[in-house]
Amino acid sequence: MLKAIKIRLYPTKTQQITINKLLGCCRLVYNLCLEHRNKIYEETKESGSLSTSYKYFCELKEMEKYSFLKTDSHSKVIQQTLMNQDVAFKNFFTKKSDFPKFKSKKDKQSCRFPKDAISSIKGNRINIIKSLKDIHFKCSRKDESYLNKNQRLISSATLIKTCSGKYYFSILIDRPNEVRFNKTNNIVGIDLGIKDLIITSNGEKFENKQFYRKQENKLKTLNRKFTKTQNGSNNHQKIRVKIAKLNEKIKNQRLWYIHHIVNQLLNENQVIVMEDLNVSGMMQNHKLSKSIQDVSFCELKQILQYKASWNDKQVVFIDRFYPSSKTCHCCGYKNDSLQLSDREWVCPECGVIHDRDINAAKNILEEGKRIIGLSSPEFKRVGEQAMASSMNLEQNVKY
């Protein structure tokens, strides 16, 4: 299985200059070739091809203005850059993404290396290309040992410079899958929210830490200072890095918390049922959009899915239009008058007092069990045994 090992690089000042030149060349070639393909599209209504971009790059190298591309860039890295651009165009024409955009040196920068570009890894030192040798790096001891012993299994690698000025090297390597979590007979339904990030059908609630909200005032202060500084000045650059570091801190805190929650859910349950939320549609509500961005539902869903697949667990999605909050999990009565502001409601049929979110999680669980009980081909039990019928499932599964 191909997995990425992300290591932190600590290059010297000379190595930083070399890396920055390489990233700058990739960005320049990408932007110039993008401009060239845009002109072709305007004139002929054709997007061009990879060979068109590479031919134009060869012409650029011969110009005196761009003669530095011969010395500061690397041919295989430029090839990968142009291949990425070609993929971006194909995704646009197949309506998978927006039109390719020009790259800025103020954003996160990256360039991709093929597997033969990494010459050797010895201890905590890595040699990438001739101009980038003996770079110090840090990662876990387990990852460092695996990289030293299995360099031949490397598929590709990506050099990354963050907005805060940190350098990383993400190495894609063939690695055996390690199952971290125990197999259980438990199934749980989860409801995603804003006040509480996750509410389970067992009544457990995971708090929304609101990492962005806690740093919002500090970010506003830095942004005000940033707008008052002169563009290109030292103070302008210093404050820009401070803003980038604070945003990076918020992102890392949120990511750590999501991993912590996902690990607990997967360690305790074999099957997890959740709603297939339309996050882009929810973002249209301007009153909730900032809070939805802060909880990062998409990140949570992505991490839960890939960790479940690595650990022989199953994630089941129910229809986004299923009325999980409005339906009484005891008698099935549907309360159409329920508003978003109603956190508790009393069922007029059976008289049960419902916590809105816990009730939704229990309904999600029951709907997930119904879907699994259909034995449709897209829902197979993870593990050695086939998924039992809904009757057997209720006997074997704790909820």
Where are these regions (language model features)?
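Acidic carboxylate diad motif detector
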Residues: 53-163
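Substrate-contacting helices/loops that form the catalytic groove of nucleic-acid
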Residues: 40-67, 151-157, 162-188, 192-301, ...
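Positively charged, low-complexity nucleic-acid-binding target-recognition regions
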Residues: 2, 290-291, 295-399
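Stable alpha-helical structural segments in soluble proteins, enriched in small hydrophobic residues
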Residues: 33, 81-92, 358-367
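Short acidic-glycine loop/turn motifs at beta-strand connectors
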Residues: 12, 122, 162-164, 201-204, ...
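Gly/serine-rich nucleotide phosphate-binding loop at the start of the catalytic core
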Residues: 1-78
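Generic recognition of long tandem-repeat/solenoid scaffolds
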Residues: 123-130, 167-171, 345-347
